[in-house]
């Protein structure tokens, strides 16, 4: 019997756009179905198990349901993906990790504040200039404030969320991987960054199926 390998999968391990092209020629449902076939064969032949926290699994299945995923594919997911809630109380995380995370979030909040202040000043000045030229209030709201709000949403979201943990499913993926001594599979920069800080093995969503195929090629 081969030594058991475990992997904890994020939703992006199935839904990544590059993975769709790699496995399904751009078709999400076909890509997910083929990925699950690889997972099933690897479980039977290579003793490789793939896990998801329940909250992440629900996120994944809800996403697939919105894209009219066939029932057969959802049954495969239910069969071959092991659902387990991480032990949030006994899993040990170094205090330095918490320090780094709080520092990271604080820096992002400060950056988000600076972005907000800059955009507000720019919108305010532009509104005053347009008002002095007797531009209608509705036109100012449409051209200046509408654009400012759109830019603020985009830049603020990027400042606060890109490259860090921004959801409970993300955190559960890392906690479960830490508990099981498992690798992490995702296409999320935040998960990658914090998996590496925790000393966890990390595989990109497009690398994982390639690895499974390579293993299976030599077994079969």
Curated annotation (Swiss-Prot):
InterPro entries: RNA_free_RNase_P. It catalyses: Endonucleolytic cleavage of RNA, removing 5'-extranucleotides from tRNA precursor. It is an enzyme of class 3 (hydrolase). Keywords: Endonuclease, Hydrolase, Nuclease, tRNA processing. GO terms for molecular function: ribonuclease P activity. Its EC number is 3.1.26.5. Disulfide bonds: none annotated. One of its GO terms (biological process) is tRNA 5'-leader removal. RNA-free RNase P that catalyzes the removal of the 5'-leader sequence from pre-tRNA to produce the mature 5'-terminus. PANTHER family: RNA-FREE RIBONUCLEASE P (PTHR41173:SF1), UPF0278 PROTEIN TK1425 (PTHR41173). Belongs to the HARP family. This is RNA-free ribonuclease P.
